[in-house]
Amino acid sequence: PWANGQGEWAEAYQRAVAIVSQMTLDEKVNLTTGTGWELEKCVGQTGGVPRLNIGGMCLQDSPLGIRDSDYNSAFPAGVNVAATWDKNLAYLRGQAMGQEFSDKGIDVQLGPAAGPLGRSPDGGRNWEGFSPDPALTGVLFAETIKGIQDAGVVATAKHYILNEQEHFRQVAEAAGYGFNISDTISSNVDDKTIHEMYLWPFADAVRAGVGAIMCSYNQINNSYGCQNSYTLNKLLKAELGFQGFVMSDWGAHHSGVGSALAGLDMSMPGDITFDSATSFWGTNLTIAVLNGTVPQWRVDDMAVRIMAAYYKVGRDRLYQPPNFSSWTRDEYGFKYFYPQEGPYEKVNHFVNVQRNHSEVIRKLGADSTVLLKNNNALPLTGKERKVAILGEDAGSNSYGANGCSDRGCDNGTLAMAWGSGTAEFPYLVTPEQAIQAEVLKHKGSVYAITDNWALSQVETLAKQASVSLVFVNSDAGEGYISVDGNEGDRNNLTLWKNGDNLIKAAANNCNNTIVVIHSVGPVLVDEWYDHPNVTAILWAGLPGQESGNSLADVLYGRVNPGAKSPFTWGKTREAYGDYLVRELNNGNGAPQDDFSEGVFIDYRGFDKRNETPIYEFGHGLSYTTF
């Protein structure tokens, strides 16, 4: 369907029609097609229309801050925002991110995410979104979008739609893991389920005026997400009335004419495969219009939608070229990175865009910390004589906070999971640093053991301690990185790196053992949660750069925990239903993922099966006594 400028889009639409009416066919096509992977400074960049003084648009990850840059903030993940249940904090985080993206010369932020929604608790990228409850996700999705766009940057609601696992999302990626498939996985779903669950947050995004939507790698009912006329034309543009533009995920564009007719508006990053110098669109889209296979109005509509989003957020008033390079931290380099061609110029200006955003990050980290259990152990007084800090998750990454590319390792404290949905840390305050500072204020003793396998040393220290604070984690991320054999999706819900044994070693020797969990989602706590010496349990999620400070604010009672769990904590992995497709089930054809459970995911599924969880969706204690 044509964009028509309905509602709050009217002025932006009229301006877009006026400017696009002045463009040649080539100029319109230029807006729709990325220039290619690693060519320009951003992870995605379109052509511009210099004749009309329109620069190419810079698109950059991620949903929690600026990826592949510097002097920017690392915000708490979406799952932490969900745990706050706080619309205002979601907005403030979005606004702060938008300001940073704008100050770096970025026009389109590739976030926030509500796909995956969180159908499976072990889905690799659930943490990038909010919660498996579509209503909670939708509200916070919308507030985040409003914040980003009020700062003058186009927000991108992603990944549309039913992109619920990492396994088999891309043919080449699957081949790298030893699976030979002809096409990516197909999420097969009925109309009721898609409307009541997976489309719901995107409806909220459209109502919030989101400028861009990213279509996903997977197929939906055996039609690719970026050339699926039912999901793009019927559901999104006709039924929801979406007025912005649809971009492909990077490498999710599979056809020229078919995707154009199905509702795709922008090809990212523009080349068919990275650095191939070939494109389904660009020159080929121009030819398709000239030979009549794509109607002229469709390309007009693509360009109008792109420019309407640009004008709607006021980007024309704030536009500046990107002042950083995604591909190098060197100050000077060739303008075109991949071929190492063009003028040799200043590519990184090292602009500090952090403002005072550490304040909202610290507050969000504290306000998203869920108190799962408390037997009068918390808050701490600060006057505990001997404090034991136990576990690698309390300490620093021995490679440095950004030492693993796209955070693709689980070293030290977990404050951000892995993949393209990450940002560079400007610093990372660890729990060990923050707790030590608290103890030293009161002249106490504090000791840290950050080797999860040093159990005899843990037992010895725990026996002497007034309180033992045990730090454990569970990580996940995007499928192009495998960490400890977890190919994006988690292999299980158990704690990583001997975490259960670490907790038991402390609890068997210290009658005041407090467990802090940093994780991407639910973990299995059945072995120790009811141990009489485990006096408190906190879930701190993925809190970003102020991790230790946020946690100390809660531990020492400066912040009364008010967060509520945005997901269910089951007794076993099986309690959630077995939804993740990990093996080929269709020969070498596209793996088939039937959403036969319908709407019954997370707590809905627990209720339907009469399955009692350990901690319910929405559970969270506070220090208040009545």
How would you describe each model-predicted region?
Residues 1-626:
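Glycoside hydrolase catalytic-domain context in secreted enzymes
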